[in-house]
């Protein structure tokens, strides 16, 4: 985020300088430079809006406020540029003066051509605005998608960890069952031997008694 903000500050210095030059000259080259810089600034702000999804919630409010301020300033620059373009177009439209009276003059053909040019410029600007808005929405959607993917990745890791723990528990359970089976076999053997010894003792006692009373 810091990298994008540094880039924004550099672009801000450039656009403010260009807008100042435009107010003085009104040249088409300066207008094109301003439009290019505004598009770059819009892209940088769009990247900030994507990056904010990865910022901790405790810091997100402050950063989001700065981003809103950047976008508001961008809209002000766009309005300023639009006003300067209008001034430049009006100057181009009524730029010829009568040398004797000093009044602006323009032929009907020039007027029609320049009117169509202004209309075409306005349509182009509207299309550019719609394109930029679509790009901003796409950037926001991409940010939401990236956040969802991160959440899914985290859930996958948790699931894998749970499966590992379940596997360990299953292994411990198998070992416990084997131990219980071994103990049960030993208990059965001990019971068999104990029963056999008791039976032998009973037989011996009976033999002794039999020999005495014979």
Curated annotation (Swiss-Prot):
Domain of life of the organism encoding this protein: Eukaryota
Pfam families: V-SNARE, V-SNARE_C
Membrane topology, Cytoplasmic segments: 1-191
Localisation: Membrane
GO molecular function: SNAP receptor activity; SNARE binding
GO cellular component: cytoplasm; cytosol; endoplasmic reticulum membrane; ER to Golgi transport vesicle membrane; fungal-type vacuole; Golgi apparatus; Golgi membrane; late endosome membrane
Key word Calcium present: no
Keywords: Coiled coil, Membrane, Protein transport, Transmembrane, Transmembrane helix, Transport
Residue intervals passing through the bilayer: 192-212
UniProt membrane topology term: Single-pass type IV membrane protein
InterPro entries: SNARE, T_SNARE_dom, v-SNARE_N_sf, Vesicle_trsprt_v-SNARE_N
Vesicular face residues: 213-214
Record-level GO BP terms: Golgi to vacuole transport; intra-Golgi vesicle-mediated transport; intracellular protein transport; late endosome to vacuole transport; macroautophagy; retrograde transport, endosome to Golgi; vesicle docking; vesicle fusion with Golgi apparatus
Tagged with keyword Cell wall biogenesis/degradation: no
Family indicated by similarity: Belongs to the VTI1 family.
Chain's role: V-SNARE that mediates vesicle transport pathways through interactions with t-SNAREs on the target membrane. These interactions are proposed to mediate aspects of the specificity of vesicle trafficking and to promote fusion of the lipid bilayers.
Protein name, as recorded: Vesicle transport v-SNARE protein vti1
Protein's organism: Schizosaccharomyces pombe (strain 972 / ATCC 24843) (Fission yeast)
Gene: vti1
